[in-house]
Amino acid sequence: MKKSYSPYSKFPVGVAGLVNDGRIVSGCNVENASYGLTLCAECSMVSNLAMTGGGRILAVVCVDKNGELLSPCGRCRQLLFEHGGKELQLLTPDGPQPMSVILPWGFGPDDLPQ
């Protein structure tokens, strides 16, 4: 959370993901004065995943500065679906939930023609 760059919203977000090879990858939000360019924590986590060898994300937890669970925005749900699939588990206030519940009609690589 200390690495979050959130001078505008004052709302730091941190995320961690378990990768299929046992690694933990993390990320934080990085804001921009042009708000549309802000990167969500999940975006930096997926970048971290790619930079450290790739793999599939098995489980994710996203929290605010107090450790309260947060729900990813729609863009980030799609990003998590791409890198973890329907089986990825997201920690929610109701316990772990698969992406198939969080994003029931997710669009992914299997939906594209070969």
Spell out what each predicted region is.
Residues 8-19:
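Short beta-strand scaffold segments in enzyme catalytic cores
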Residues 15, 28, 37, 75:
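Gly/Ser/Thr-rich helix-start
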Residues 18-20, 29-30:
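Histidine- and/or cysteine-centered catalytic micro-motif in compact active-site loops
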Residues 29-43:
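Compact, glycine-rich, soluble single-domain proteins
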Residues 42-46, 73:
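A general structural signal for well-ordered alpha-helical segments in protein cores
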Residues 49:
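Basic DNA-binding helix
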